Each structure stands twice: as C-alpha cells, then as structure tokens.
A protein has these predicted regions:
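Thiol-/selenol-based redox modules, centered on thioredoxin-like
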Residues: 142-200
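Structural microenvironment flanking redox-active thiols in thiol-disulfide oxidoreductases
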Residues: 68-113, 124-130
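Bacterial Sec-dependent N-terminal signal peptides
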Residues: 1-22
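N-terminal "domain-start" segment that seeds a small globular fold
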Residues: 19-47
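Short, thiol/selenol-centered motifs that function as redox-active sites or metal-ligating centers
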Residues: 61-70, 140, 196-199
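Short, internal strand/loop/helix patches
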Residues: 108-148, 152
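Loop/turn elements at helix/coil->beta-strand transitions in domains of secreted/extracellular proteins
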Residues: 52-54, 83-88, 114-119, 137
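Short active-site neighborhood of thiol/selenol oxidoreductases, capturing the structured segment around
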Residues: 47-68, 177
Length: 200
C-alpha cells in the first residue's frame, strides 16, 4: 500500500511539474526565413539580403521603457555593422490591441522621430517571435549566414547595462558580431534578455 501511495505521489509530481524546456531557437539552430511588413509598406525577408554575412534580429517596441532605453544603441549597431554585412532587422512582436502604442502608425512615427535606418517590421499575427523563442523587448538574436541558412550564434541582451550606455562593461552583441566577422570563437553565446514581456 505504501508503495502504491509513493508511486501516486511521484506520478502526480511529474504530471504537474512545470515544463522548463525553452521553446524557440537555440545556439546552432537554423532560423526560418520570414516575410513581414515594414513601416514603409514593403515586405522584408532575410532572403532579400543576398550579400549579408549575418543579421542582428531585434525584437523591440515603442512602449517598453527597456526598449526605449536601447533605441539609440540599436541604431548605433546598424550604423556600425550594416555596411560590414550584419544589418539590424527590428521586429515589433506585441499585440497592438493590448498595446495601441505599438501600432504600425505609432511605429512609423517613432522611427521618424529617432531616425531609424533599419527595417522596423510588425509581427502582425504574432507567429515569428514564438519561432525564435523571444520573450522580452528587447530580445536579440545574432544570426550568421551559412550554406545551411542563417544559423543562430547569440541570444539575449545587447549589453550589460540597460540604464546607462556609458557604464556598459560588456557589449555582448558587438563581441559576437566582431568575432563572427573575424572568424574567431567567442565565449558568451547566451545571456538573459532584460526587458518587458511580449504582450499577447
């Protein structure tokens, strides 16, 4: 009887244990291409960038204070790396019914105010961010173009200080992209994304 009780307890524990396996891409996975509407009305895909060595995919938005704090740094990444073959592609993943401040019109206004030089796309049906496994804004994925397709090489935060760019000690994205451009290994492939939860 005691054995049966113990088994029941174990089965119940397993049945109700949280699923800790992260969904989405991991390091080394090949990212699927997408086709999303840009703020200029055109659709953008990774395959549009025939000569790209890789991509800096940024899930971001207008309404999250963390995302706003990183806007200038995201623009700086594009200015530094787009010409070297690693353009920034920003994707707004939030449900606009939940966050009207992230509507396409609001995205267009914000991009103009900030002078964004990168595509700012809307994940209108919220189908792309789950593929990546993004949970925050901002959430970064550095991809490297290979014969297999765009391979995920870094996932996480842009750097180690969202509050003050002048106090940043480690620039995770820059370190990853620089290493990929130079064909050398780098240590930090994953960090914790700091930001607001993506709104459903």
């Amino acid at each position: 009887m005691k054995t049966i009780f113990t088994l029941l307890v174990l089965l119940t524990t397993v049945a109700f244990a949280p699923n800790t396996k992260e969904k989405g891409y991991d390091i080394g996975d090949v990212a699927t291409d997408f086709k999303l509407k840009n703020i200029d009305g055109n659709s953008v895909s990774l395959s549009d960038y025939k000569d790209a060595k890789g991509f800096i995919i940024v899930f971001t938005c207008n309404t999250c204070p963390y995302a706003v704090a990183y806007e200038d740094r995201i623009e700086a990444l594009n200015k530094k790396y787009a010409a070297k073959g690693f353009p920034v592609i920003a994707i707004m993943p939030n449900n606009v019914k939940t966050k009207p401040g992230d509507s396409m019109k609001a995205m267009q206004i914000r991009a103009k105010e900030k002078g964004f030089t990168f595509p700012y796309l809307m994940d209108a049906d919220q189908s792309i961010y789950p593929q990546y496994g993004a949970t925050k804004t901002p959430h970064i994925y550095v991809l490297e173009s290979t014969d297999r397709g765009p391979v995920v090489e870094y996932i996480g935060a842009i750097d180690d200080n969202y509050k003050d760019a002048s106090l940043v000690k480690t620039k995770y994205v820059e370190n990853a992209v620089d290493a990929l451009l130079n064909g050398v290994a780098f240590e930090v492939h994953k960090t914790k994304a700091i930001g607001c939860s993506i709104k459903l």
